[in-house]
Amino acid sequence: MSLLSKLHLILYICLLLLPLRFVNAEQLSGSGESQPVHIEADRIDGHYQQEIEATGNVRMRRGDQTLSADHVKYYQDTEDVEVKGNALLERPDDTLWGTFLQMNLQTDIGELRDPRYALKGGNGRGSGSLLLLEGENQYRIKKARYTTCPEDNHDWYILADDLEIDNEKKVGTARHASIRFKDVPILYLPWMNFSFSKERKTGFLSPIMGNTSRSGVEVSVPFYWNIAPNYDATITPRLMSRRGVMLDNEFRYIGQGLGGRLQFDYLPNDLVTDTTRYGLQFNHSQFLGSGWFGALNYNRVSDHNYFRDLGNNILFTSQVNLLQQATASYFSELGRNGMLTFSTLMQQFQTVQDPRAPIISPFKILPRFTLNAVKSNVYGLDFDLASSFTHFSHPTLPHGLRFTAFPSVALPLENSFGFIRPRVGLHYTKYDLNTPAFPGTNDKHPDRSVPIFSLDSGVVLERDMTLGGGNFIQTLEPRVFYTYIPYREQRLLPNFDSAEMDFSFAQLFMEKRFSGEDRINDANEITLAMSSRLIHSATGNERLRFSVGQRIRFSDRRVLLTSPQVTRAGSDFIAELSGSLAQHVKTDAGIQLNQNNLLIEKIRTGISYNPAPGQVINAGYRFTRDVLEQVDLSTQWPFLKRWQGFAAINYSLKNDKLLAGLLGLEYNACCWSLRLVASRFTTATQKTSTNIFVQLELNDLMRIGTNPIRVLQQSIPGYVRTDLQ
């Protein structure tokens, strides 16, 4: 070996043995297959593949982790790191601070003293006395504090002896936890877990507390069971001071082409009534393949007072007939421009009775088969067939079988500015009854054939106009609709499902005046109507619509249900207005005027002012001569700072009675909300129920109390949660 080569070798060995000093950056590799470590600092000392000591503005990167501190000691052979002074560990799922850190970079095991932490992907943060790193995405905090409030805000927090954070499952688990609001303990839980993401997880949900006039103080503790990605269950023990312990159970499922929900609430022994009480709701729908679809909707309660005593949902408590129904349907194309549908239906109702005013329950349908076919543009004609076969059953009224068929053909003549559509059909009905429908007749097999003719026509005229600085299209749409149906005697036919339809602008253009199939009205009448729409030229949105119309009769009406014979030459006068009267102001109004005496028969008015989310005022008035007169008022409106007020009233002027009322307040802080709502409503059995909702919502953690959101949504059209904005 030459002298020069020997000198090079000696110099290389000396460089390896010399400590590293005054180096700004160094890339190092630990043992095995570990990721490279990059260190930046004011000063770095150490030996290659042994111990590295960095001081001053230290920044150490390994993979997706970054460690910052005043002083770092790194052992390359074991990948242990020791950090002193202002330790900051940044990772994809969280950021950790502390005064002293010991950890292994490969196993993520170690400890952090005097820790503070912030969870990414959410607002969770906190502190503790000691943080134990227990592997990738896992750590445990001793004497922990947790909150979702921002820095320097301690309105609410959890104090726990032990808090586990699982960043992989996005779940926190606290032991011996005290929830504090404004530094006051409000709830102690020996064990609790919570999610700091929107993903579903198994565990106890926040307790629900409230008070009702019928059940007293209520406390519920829901348990959510995430059984599988496509089905879950919520089991809720509900303790009522006056009635005992009720178990509310909800099961939901969804699959390919199917889905459903089962709600079963069970009170084994009501302390007030000394009876077993329950409520059941089951909904299921499913595509069966090859054009078939099935659905089931079953509702039942144990007794007539169930909703009044145990319900807190306005929609349910106002129900009289609880639907119990199963359907199966088939859909298929019928060649080109055609559709064939077949369906079967089983239907009955549980009638919730008011002992002071009992009603007759509806007929059972056991079963009904329907077959409908539509074929369009056959040599310019549209063919239609509607048919049904139904078995009606009732414990006290005459019942039996009914067959109906209504074939029709229409000739649609249309172009860009108007249309003419004549149609002719024959409605046939046949009965097979267990007993004659009325005393004095022996016919148990009556039938009826009624031809029906109609002619619908209309024109659409347009013009451009400028209004309020905007460009609009105004339409003028006159429409004429003529119907001829000869009179057929029907007083001796049963009436299973026919009722007179509400008179409205849309009903002016219908051939039939009755729903169902048992009554076919006679008609020789013409409808004259005019509509005008205001359409925004750029967007195509309809800004305003005004419609007016009247049906003129050329002969007296003879087919009636309960009303006296109508001999007037014309129907009542109908006018409707809907759309935006001004910015943020919407209206929907209608009036029905008696043409003979110019008396108002019906009024429907509604106006809404909604300048921004969380700001809405609604007002409505409804009037039907000799039937009802009601006023509806509701609002959601902010006042002061962070406060909102709620109010709603449905009042009967005819009976001088409050039908439903609501009053509430909400305070929205940056990380919590407090809601107080009182509601009172009349049930289907004409009895009143009063509920008080108090709820404290700790953002991204839990809700304590009874949730009034559903009641607010039902009572105030346009209500939105401003804490989610």
Curated annotation (Swiss-Prot):
GO terms classed as biological process: Gram-negative-bacterium-type cell outer membrane assembly; lipopolysaccharide transport
GO cellular component terms, A-Z: cell outer membrane; transporter complex
Signal sequence residues: 1-25
Compartment(s) of residence: Cell outer membrane
Keywords: Cell outer membrane, Membrane, Signal
Pfam name, any one: LptD_N
PANTHER family registered for this protein in UniProt: LPS-ASSEMBLY PROTEIN (PTHR30189), LPS-ASSEMBLY PROTEIN LPTD (PTHR30189:SF1)
HAMAP family, alphabetized: LPS_assembly_LptD
Function: Together with LptE, is involved in the assembly of lipopolysaccharide (LPS) at the surface of the outer membrane.
Protein name: LPS-assembly protein LptD
